[in-house]
Amino acid sequence: MADTDLFMECEEEELEPWQKISDVIEDSVVEDYNSVDKTTTVSVSQQPVSAPVPIAAHASVAGHLSTSTTVSSSGAQNSDSTKKTLVTLIANNNAGNPLVQQGGQPLILTQNPAPGLGTMVTQPVLRPVQVMQNANHVTSSPVASQPIFITTQGFPVRNVRPVQNAMNQVGIVLNVQQGQTVRPITLVPAPGTQFVKPTVGVPQVFSQMTPVRPGSTMPVRPTTNTFTTVIPATLTIRSTVPQSQSQQTKSTPSTSTTPTATQPTSLGQLAVQSPGQSNQTTNPKLAPSFPSPPAVSIASFVTVKRPGVTGENSNEVAKLVNTLNTIPSLGQSPGPVVVSNNSSAHGSQRTSGPESSMKVTSSIPVFDLQDGGRKICPRCNAQFRVTEALRGHMCYCCPEMVEYQKKGKSLDSEPSVPSAAKPPSPEKTAPVASTPSSTPIPALSPPTKVPEPNENVGDAVQTKLIMLVDDFYYGRDGGKVAQLTNFPKVATSFRCPHCTKRLKNNIRFMNHMKHHVELDQQNGEVDGHTICQHCYRQFSTPFQLQCHLENVHSPYESTTKCKICEWAFESEPLFLQHMKDTHKPGEMPYVCQVCQYRSSLYSEVDVHFRMIHEDTRHLLCPYCLKVFKNGNAFQQHYMRHQKRNVYHCNKCRLQFLFAKDKIEHKLQHHKTFRKPKQLEGLKPGTKVTIRASRGQPRTVPVSSNDTPPSALQEAAPLTSSMDPLPVFLYPPVQRSIQKRAVRKMSVMGRQTCLECSFEIPDFPNHFPTYVHCSLCRYSTCCSRAYANHMINNHVPRKSPKYLALFKNSVSGIKLACTSCTFVTSVGDAMAKHLVFNPSHRSSSILPRGLTWIAHSRHGQTRDRVHDRNVKNMYPPPSFPTNKAATVKSAGATPAEPEELLTPLAPALPSPASTATPPPTPTHPQALALPPLATEGAECLNVDDQDEGSPVTQEPELASGGGGSGGVGKKEQLSVKKLRVVLFALCCNTEQAAEHFRNPQRRIRRWLRRFQASQGENLEGKYLSFEAEEKLAEWVLTQREQQLPVNEETLFQKATKIGRSLEGGFKISYEWAVRFMLRHHLTPHARRAVAHTLPKDVAENAGLFIDFVQRQIHNQDLPLSMIVAIDEISLFLDTEVLSSDDRKENALQTVGTGEPWCDVVLAILADGTVLPTLVFYRGQMDQPANMPDSILLEAKESGYSDDEIMELWSTRVWQKHTACQRSKGMLVMDCHRTHLSEEVLAMLSASSTLPAVVPAGCSSKIQPLDVCIKRTVKNFLHKKWKEQAREMADTACDSDVLLQLVLVWLGEVLGVIGDCPELVQRSFLVASVLPGPDGNINSPTRNADMQEELIASLEEQLKLSGEHSESSTPRPRSSPEETIEPESLHQLFEGESETESFYGFEEADLDLMEI
């Protein structure tokens, strides 16, 4: 059969009681299961008796024993009912070749026998047994049957030769120990085979025996042997030798007589007799012959003996065996089959048996389906209260029984057809018609159906149904969702116990709890770099986690992924075998406990809960799907799941806190909930083929000598029930190419990996597979490099827990790009360079003898001649198209560089090419913070690239995909240039020029170049528009509070927002610059009021403007009572202040610590400037020359925000309102403690209405932020820098600096106070006051006014020359500066490519600007 098909029978439920018990034993928890039958009712179906039974013997025994299945039991029941279980033996032994012989296979189940046999057991124990047989066997068998005896401890059994005692024959003895776990025992013969073969030779099993009553002497027969096998926990015994090859030995028929008063009566045997059989003596000549039905023997208990008890009880067992063998129908077995778990001997020899000459057949069996008013399935022992339910269950559980029951009446009325089997022997007294050959449908996995004689040929073809895995195993059930739609939803708020934040509804609270866990993982409190964020499984290494994410949680659909337990498998046959062994048809283990909605997929239940049960009081645990109604209980339960001691279900992705919950979940939910619709109404026995995909299945030849053809149509062999390990998917062609490449490289001697700089002792282990990082664009085939990448970039802790796995590169060996002049000694840097420059095809190794002259920081140029020589030595056309992974050899000669150029694994080369493990395309520190340059590196010119340093060397971005398309290669900025531009956008151009030692004009030119190419779309998944708006709002809020917005804080916040909203994303310098420009986040924009704010911020700004103007109109507030207040915090670095060369950087207006002093500015809408209050942290007397417009408050410990507002209100505002005697309005931001109850009460006491500016809106609607505040800060910066240059060699303390700041404040406030129109227009630009016509000005009009105000005030303060970077550069008068670099770019880029001009390069053009 095809390797992707599995033949399965339409069965609604296959969960046997022994499967439940094995689950419990696996979890080391013993529980009482009420589903297991604990009564002693035994339902027995006998099979045809075809052994040569003498007439006299049959006449004497028929009244007591009319079946070949004997159950020994007593009335005394053991009180320990928890260990009773079901033992099922299914032997479909039709008239064909039986599993054991046609003489009848007795099943001897002993349980506390009668006093005549003595006490031999004390308690029952669980022992399941199954016996199966194929359908296509021959019609007759020459060997008699053997009994099956099940006990709990080994006992001596005399293997007496038939000449001594013919009644001492034991069939199959299943010997187990109390408390021992024994899984199902399956005995499966091959077609045309039998387990008991005629043979010669008798080994001695034991030597002592308690005497028992002898039976009649039997005629001499050939010697027989025993078949001894040790049964492990799970055993499958297959008979493979065809019957035609077995040695047949004829024997003489035997006769024996048995007294009428035999032991079976005293044993309390249960004999089930078929209809038509008489309890009186029956003449075999008159007995009709019918086709033999399949025989199913079912018993409820197995006898148990305590392990420590030996001696006398063992003899009693032997007495019972010998006594039972005195019965003729049980004593005709030619040889015993002993199966013991205490014996180490194994053997399989043939025995001889008598030929059958006379058959006593029975009619259709009668199944005892009643048990105390309940209906019981004869196969799985499932209980039903209604007969119709049992009938429907049996149609799928045991259809062959139903089929034969339907045919019973017609078979009873019709005589049987004589068989063409062997003719009767001359010794037979009377011939009897034998059973015709008929092949019923077996109970499990029917291959084909042979038509019966009375069936039409058209109906003989077996129906076949082909189903996909999704249709057969997966499904969903709506539960009570329809009933819940009628009830109204009432949102319930929840308060987080960690941060006391109140969430609006249950879904927000659930997401908030997950956010706390993610924060713990980022802070390093929880080691989360090996935990899957999708299914919450723990992996041993980040590499295994990455492979799991790619195989299971990738967006690509896979035909080898189990959607129930969320595991991936290497091939479809393994996947199908897993589904057959682990899951049931229509299994839906994920259940919503609120409405009983269930599904086979976890994601469907999760989405269902978030959609249907939103705005309710229910809280869903994502780990075990438990529902809570209390927030504290949910939080405690949620945090307990973060611990290690959880119990994972091996059949799905759920994990539980207690083993009891796990066991209950497996018993209740891992079974068929609802059979697939395709199986409804099918004919019993329909063959169902399961396929993993719709495509044609592949055929794989099976090279097995001992496997019969029919075995290919059976189900695949059983596998372990343990959790499957993730399998790394890889195309077979690529796997073979990789193996060949690894073998070729292994013979090249000692190798060193250029990516991690470690030696490669074992190529398969060092390059196991090609993996991609799910958090960024990093890809590699080096396991050590991948681990290092995860540790360095995706483990969010301040101090790394693990050291990097890189070694220092070997000096003297460098990598050179064959398409440009880029040279480095770090393989990772070269990989980055090749990734971001697709047109650069490969790299080469420069041996130790060659040197590379790089452009130094002193202006030396590169050796262009050497560059051309290298290109001639390794011409680009000789390299493959894709980038290569280069491996350097320690044995390479200095004159001949050794290189192995390999294309990427997904893009396979020609068959003749040799492939090595895939290369390492990387992304520059995506998600993690880009490395900050050191002090020395920041002082370097950006264009001076130190090729040997991995810190300063960065590749050039190529977003276009080619150097000659659309925007030329020169239009793209390198990562280092983008970093400088980002610094200028976060701070300003002047600070960027000072920080990186680059001219401001060059930085502004880079910015213009980048804006010219801004229309290109970035490839890959970056932050969405919603996430970018959240980030833009954060930037605006940070600047309002004078908190730093730089490269580090920006990337940290972007990472946090991206993970919380999107999961996976990318961050780069190019994206960061585009983000700052797209949202107009430059700190000194002159037209900020016209810029578009984020959506939520813009809505809040509109509401604020409407509120303010409405209150001014309704309250008729005068302009003299409308005040705007804001604080300016000044930060002083005393260490920098005490230095000689960095004093100008000591005073800053951005910081995170306690401010050195706070300046409170206040202006009125009529153009008046209120006195400015300065709060100084320290002791200082009032300066004598302090301006009248400034008030000073000094205290050693400083002032809190509430104290600042209280002092300002007392010393400034209340004095002003006392003169006005009118209501007022105070415009202030929402930061600090402006919204505290103390501040609001203070304002209410002075009849002042607070107008609070929403967060992120100050740059547009705060009158002080429009023009005055930024100008004051720039003026203080300018004055301090001038003062720092003058006092470079003199000491300066904070008191002296404060006096200077007070003087400068007085100067700037004097200028502003002399321009009341400027102050009043600030309120108009901020839309606090309406325009002259009573309407709000347009954004363009306000932006023009803002630009005019800034220019006018800077001109009066003489700041225009220092801060004119946003305006158009003025023409220079110097002849040396009249040549613009842009003109040269336009000249060379106008009609041709810049690469065709060898006289100028990017660095040369940049140097002309200095």
UniProtKB/Swiss-Prot annotation:
There is a cross-link at K319, K359, K422, K449, K489, K629, K677, K801, K883 (Glycyl lysine isopeptide (Lys-Gly) (interchain with G-Cter in SUMO2)). Keywords: Autism spectrum disorder, Cell cycle, Cell division, Chromosome, Coiled coil, Cytoplasm, Disease variant, DNA damage, DNA recombination, DNA repair, DNA-binding, Intellectual disability, Isopeptide bond, Metal-binding, Nucleus, Phosphoprotein, Repeat, Ubl conjugation, Zinc, Zinc-finger. Residues 860-870 have a biased composition (Basic and acidic residues). Changing S1396A: Loss of phosphorylation. Loss of interaction with PSIP1. Residues 810-850 are annotated as: Required for interaction with CBX5. Changing C817A: Diminishes interaction with CBX5 and abolishes interaction with CBX1 and CBX5. Residues 1340-1360 form a coiled coil. Residues 1015-1085 form the HTH CENPB-type domain. It is linked to Defects in POGZ may be associated with neuropsychiatric disorders such as autism spectrum disorders (ASD), bipolar affective disorders and early dementia onset. ASD are characterized by impairments in reciprocal social interaction and communication as well as restricted and stereotyped patterns of interest and activities. ASD include forms with moderate to severe cognitive impairment and milder forms with higher cognitive ability (Asperger syndrome). Plays a role in mitotic cell cycle progression and is involved in kinetochore assembly and mitotic sister chromatid cohesion. Probably through its association with CBX5 plays a role in mitotic chromosome segregation by regulating aurora kinase B/AURKB activation and AURKB and CBX5 dissociation from chromosome arms. Promotes the repair of DNA double-strand breaks through the homologous recombination pathway. This is Pogo transposable element with ZNF domain. It comes from Homo sapiens. The gene is POGZ.
